[in-house]
Amino acid sequence: MAAACPFASPPLKSDFELSESSNPLEIYAQFDDLRTTCPVAYTSQMGGYWMLTRYEDVKNCASDTATFISSVKAVIPSDPRGTRRPPLNTDPPVHTPYRTAIDRTLKASRLKTLEHILEAHARREWRQLVDRGRGDVSADFGANFAAWVEVTWLNLADASAPVLARTAAAWVNAWREQNKEEVRFHSDKLYDMAKALFRDRRQSPRNVENDPASSLLAERVDGQRIPEEKLM
């Protein structure tokens, strides 16, 4: 029997509203309660969506790509600009060439070679936070370390890390606030970095097993290169 789309007639009443607390214990408590009382819950927040709270439900839905798709909504809240990019906002088989190219650079053998580099970045960023004696673990450590992970994985110059950290953090905050103009402003900066990267790799291709941009440029869709606008 085909599954029915829940948004054909969304519930009139929300089952929950996400806690605004920054206390992890309170957040976990809300999820524990939902798992017990309403494991498949609906909220009208952010345009309305359903949330699964039990592992088996999440696993089964993630494995059923015919019923549960990404091409309608993949991120909550949605991009305020209405922009949709592969592979995140596409379903199989459309996303397959992109995932193939990306997965090629995430094999265990490559990640093993990056382990000591990323560990050094993590230790340095954490030490800076500790030496200051104060700070925000998410903003001061998480954002910076995530930028170093991207820089290392993409084979960017080290000087890109601080710029990437600041721009990505500002972009995420603007997205959360659904500030369309700010999202576009910071997104354009990220696109400029991506365009420069692909321009360099076209001129000087690298090993597709170790370089995501080179891997994407080498991938083909029906015998054709991935279009420029879908590489970003």
What are these regions (language model features)?
Residues 1-138, 142, 147-165, 169-177, ...:
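Active-site substrate-recognition loop segments, prototypically the cytochrome P450 B′-helix/B-C loop
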Residues 231-232:
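Cytochrome P450 catalytic-core helices
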Residues 227:
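Cytosolic ligand/metal-binding cores
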Residues 166-224:
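Cytochrome P450 catalytic core segment centered on helix I
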